[in-house]
Swiss-Prot record:
GO terms for biological process: glycine biosynthetic process; threonine catabolic process. Belongs to the threonine aldolase family. It catalyses: L-threonine = acetaldehyde + glycine; L-allo-threonine = acetaldehyde + glycine. Optimum pH is 8.5-9.0. It is an enzyme of class 4 (lyase). The keyword Lyase applies. This is Low specificity L-threonine aldolase. The keyword Hydrolase does not apply. SUPFAM superfamilies: PLP-dependent transferases. Keywords: Lyase, Pyridoxal phosphate. One of its GO terms (cellular component) is cytosol. One of its GO terms (molecular function) is pyridoxal phosphate binding. The gene is ltaE.
């Protein structure tokens, strides 16, 4: 089966599984798992931050990030289509009494800082206290302009706001920039990394920041049910991914660009391609039929009027050629 629904469908390689089986473990709730500690230290080293914490999921990592920045009755400014606003069940509001203040992102995925400034609440008892600006990089595949990262950082310093980056696919951004992680994470107070998307681990995310911040995050992780015991088996996959699967993300980007060109040549309405994602408009009338057509040919896609295709380490160029041929045949019916 060729699965292009998301890069969350990736499976651990044989080498990754061997690293997991060989991992020394301990009780991480006590801080005694050497492999978890090694992963956290390595993430902090790569990013130039003081500390990191390993969590089961990206949703929990974002939730803990917000809970560790904001008190009850405070707010974070966030993109209208950001994952930690739109797709995480309102966790910060439900569990933390943290108010989101969404704004529309610009076409390049940035939150215009003049619009952000207009949403910062005055010091008045009628309003929630604005505490945090939350960005997403990459955002729906789009890499935020590097100069914007510095501008947003300086903006938040001037206004006494914290800056968090949902970096579920931050290494896709790193590869696209052609830089080291720490060159961009210097411009945020905290950020997350999802290990189970393009990096190919079966489970796990990281939250990275300064030592005091991560100390608060450890407490919130425990309170929200994320304290794990012998989780070094999972952390070993993360170490393997960070050491072996980052540079190869360029292959996913190249495959997505190649696939976009193939579909354009076939007559498909390719709206855009960024990093490892491409978006194809098929229309309401064709969405279900295309999904069924592809599934019958062992291809899984999200059947919707605008189809998002995501390339990853478990899909080869040869398999993409098969998908392009099927798409061409569908359009020629």
């Amino acid at each position: 089966m060729i699965d292009l629904r998301s890069d969350t469908v990736t499976r651990p390689s044989r080498a990754m599984l061997e690293a997991m089986m060989a991992a020394p473990v301990g009780d991480d709730v006590y801080g005694d798992d050497p492999t978890v500690n090694a992963l956290q230290d390595y993430a902090a080293e790569l990013s130039g931050k003081e500390a990191a914490i390993f969590l089961p999921t990206g949703t929990q990592a974002n939730l803990v990030a917000l809970l560790s920045h904001c008190e009850r009755g405070e707010e974070y400014i966030v993109g209208q289509a950001a994952h930690n606003y739109l797709f995480e069940a309102g966790g910060a509001a439900v569990l933390g009494s943290i108010q989101p203040q969404p704004i529309d992102a610009a076409a390049d995925g940035t939150l215009p800082l003049d619009k952000v400034a207009m949403k910062i609440k005055p010091d008045d008892i009628h309003f929630a206290r604005t505490k945090l600006l939350s960005l997403e990089n990459t955002h729906n595949g789009k890499v935020l302009p590097r100069e914007y990262l510095k501008e947003a950082w300086e903006f938040t310093r001037e206004r006494n706001l914290a800056l968090h980056v949902d970096g579920a696919r931050i290494f896709n951004a790193v590869v696209a920039y052609g830089c080291e992680l720490k060159e961009i994470t210097q411009y945020c107070d905290s950020f997350t990394i999802c290990l189970s998307k393009g990096l190919g681990t079966p489970v796990g995310s990281l939250l990275v920041g300064n030592r005091d911040y991560i100390k608060r995050a450890i407490r919130w992780r425990k309170m929200t049910g994320g304290g794990m015991r012998q989780s070094g088996i999972l952390a070993a996959a993360g170490i393997y991914a960070l050491k072996n699967n980052v540079a190869r993300l360029q292959e996913d980007h190249d495959n997505a660009a190649w696939m976009a060109e193939q579909l354009r040549e076939a007559g498909a309405d390719v709206m855009r391609q960024d990093t490892n994602m491409l978006f194809v408009r098929v229309g309401e009338e064709n969405a279900a039929a295309l999904g069924e057509y592809m599934k019958a040919r062992n291809v899984l896609i999200n059947a919707s009027p605008i189809v998002r295709l995501v390339t990853h380490l478990d899909v080869s160029r040869e398999q993409l050629a098969e998908v392009a041929a099927h798409w061409r045949a569908f359009l020629a019916r």
